[in-house]
Design a protein with these regions (language model features):
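Flavin (primarily FAD) binding-site architecture
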Residues: 244-256
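Extreme N-terminal leader/targeting segments of oxidoreductases
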Residues: 1-36, 51-54
């Protein structure tokens, strides 16, 4: 372990909390230096921290806000196998995505990722060409899965299903002249922000210092001024290498980086509005050959309907907002496949994220490469940008490889390909965990420990499938420092404003109980 654990005696070395943050801030402020400073607490940054810490390097990660504050919490929550990239001829990223999906589902995070069926209904407007294109794509996805060595017991093969079976999977699908459906399987995360937190905690268990509400200023390749955004105190941290993993804010740390962000928007619906589907209704976008709108069954009885791809020029906001045009587009597209059309009254909330795409020239943002890049600037800051949530581990590996070479660091080989995250276990082990299914899906083998927090730990919060013990665990183990962290990133209650309002008193109580 690169650094000794700084938690209390006998404490969980992966636990992140306010006391640990204060202790580690004080230690660093006394003038120590580290091998690697990581700026950015999204999926890429925490991935870099974990990779470096498990190679034996001393690591500090800082984020001005919170873990998963930016794009990492606004995804479709898919561990995507890369089928779209295959359709556009990008075989390399397609295979990389399939391999990384398999690693998540079978080794590193099987507790957080499940196989999700996607259903494309065969409706009167589905042409023979359209059907053939989808079927060919799904078969290609089967080949991708096989070449990535993900077993069919984890991700079943694609298949055609009858009209009656299609209605069982998606009860709201249009019934008139339904000619069956085509189904394929992909990986679905219980939540993207939860994956980020789990990676951060795993990094912490290997000695990485994870400091949120800490900004990095006057950044060079060997140092940065760190500021505690809660107190205003500052100090200079020296590091042998610095990695910029700030996503859509990367050019603020390294002005030589040129990004062209695109906005991806989702709507949040009540699962009842689609008859509580167990498959993701997948609707081709008219006029497009390899783009779809997905109605994704999600936790807490919700549906995430997305996604758009719109240019987002100008200043980068902390929290992007969906446009009216995007809301209308998503509703209009999914309604082509529904028996009863959705309206704006069915929309409980929206969320939008900005993709940190490298600017490679003209064309629409939908056509820009999703490849990641690792760039070393004139000031020796190493920036990792682009890519996809699914491929975070490989992005991190490439960034740390670059940092090791640039800084002449004495580091071991990458270990993250086979390293389980906190709570991870095989499906057979997870099935034996004595806790409600929702808790096991979010916490894996830690679910029993979560339940043990408080006498009324299983009491529901705001009438949702979230219990009071989860709020307590977020404060004691997951680095939540305020109610926004609890409601907007650790639990995702905040995606629906009315749910957030009802849960606010419970969230405030979780901090008073510390």
């Amino acid at each position: 372990m690169a650094d000794s654990d700084r938690s209390a005696p006998n404490a969980d070395p992966s636990a992140l909390n306010a006391a640990r943050r204060t202790r580690e801030w004080d230690e660093l402020s006394r003038g120590s230096s580290v091998d690697l400073l990581v700026i950015g607490g999204g999926i890429t940054g925490v991935g870099v921290a974990l990779d470096a810490a498990t190679r034996g390097l001393s690591v500090v990660l800082v984020d001005k806000h919170d873990l998963a504050f930016g794009t990492s919490r606004w995804s479709s929550k898919l561990a995507h196998g890369g089928l779209r990239y295959l359709a556009s001829g990008n075989i390399g990223i397609a295979r990389e995505s399939a391999v990384e999906r398999g690693i998540l589902m079978t080794r590193t995070a099987p507790h957080l990722v499940r196989a999700m069926p996607q259903l494309v209904p065969l409706l009167p407007q589905t042409s023979f060409f359209g059907k053939s294109l989808v079927r060919t794509g799904f078969l290609a996805g089967d080949v991708l899965r096989a070449t990535a060595r993900t077993p069919s017991s984890v991700l079943p093969r694609s298949r055609a299903v009858s009209a009656s079976r299609a209605r069982e999977l998606v009860p709201a699908v249009r019934q008139a002249d339904l000619r069956g459906a085509l189904t394929a399987y992909d990986g679905q995360l219980i939540d993207d922000a939860r994956l980020v937190v789990n990676i951060a905690r795993t990094a912490a268990s290997f000695g990485a210092r994870i400091l949120t509400r800490v900004g990095a200023y006057e950044v060079s390749g060997t140092s940065a001024t760190l500021r505690d955004e809660l107190t205003g105190t500052e100090f200079l941290l020296r590091a042998r290498t610095v990695v910029n993993a700030t996503g859509v804010w990367a050019d603020q740390v390294d002005p030589s980086i040129t990004l062209r962000p695109s906005r991806g928007t989702h709507l949040v619906l009540d699962a009842n509005s689609l008859g509580n589907p167990t498959a993701a209704l997948t609707v081709p976008i008219p006029g497009e050959t390899n783009r779809f709108v997905f109605a994704l069954p999600a936790q807490l009885g919700r549906i995430y309907l997305g996604l758009t791809d719109e240019a987002a020029p100008g200043p980068v906001p902390d929290v992007p907002q969906a446009s009216d045009a995007e809301v209308d587009f998503l509703l209009a597209t999914v309604n082509t496949a529904l028996e009863v059309p959705l309206t704006r009254a069915d929309v409980l909330g929206t969320f939008a994220g900005l993709r940190p795409l490298l600017d490679t020239g003209g064309g629409s943002t939908a056509d820009l490469s999703r490849n990641h890049a690792v760039v070393r600037s004139a000031t020796d800051v190493i920036t990792v940008v682009g890519g996809k949530l699914t491929t975070y581990r490989k992005m991190a590996e490439d960034a740390v490889d670059c940092a090791v070479e640039a800084g002449g660091l004495n580091a071991g080989p990458c270990r993250t390909r086979n390293l389980p995250l906190v709570g991870a276990a095989s499906r057979a082990v997870l099935d034996q965990v004595r806790a409600p299914a929702g808790l096991v899906a979010r916490y894996g083998t830690e679910a029993e420990a979560v339940i043990g927090l408080g006498d009324d730990g299983l009491r529901q919060v705001a009438g949702l499938d979230i219990c009071a013990a989860e709020l307590a665990f977020a404060v004691s183990h997951e680095g939540a420092l305020d109610v926004d962290d609890l409601l907007d990133r650790r639990t995702r209650i905040g995606l629906v404003a009315s749910d957030r309002e009802r849960a606010l008193p419970e969230a405030e109580q979780a901090f008073r109980a510390v």
